Amino acid sequence: MTQKVTASYDAPTEDVKAACRDALANTPKILEDPASAVYLSNYGESSIEYTVFCWCSAADYWDVYFGLGENLRNAFAAHSVEMTYDHLNVHIVENRG
């Protein structure tokens, strides 16, 4: 299974990877062999993307998928890693004529 997460450019890579490894360790039903892995996979416009790989049985796929997603969010918070998201700032200029 693969899940992608993004983190701020301000977050040290090792802190992000540690948070991801904690999330993996706290997610039941992930297989130990083959081993899970976390990689820095992309430099985006406003964030860095990390790809989290793990293995589970087909019967456990959805439990692991959703459990890992929640655990990633919690681990990022515990490690003070900012999860990024796209946003748009709009400035409204008044018509002065």
Segments predicted by a language model, with ranges:
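A small-molecule sensor/coupling module
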Residues: M1
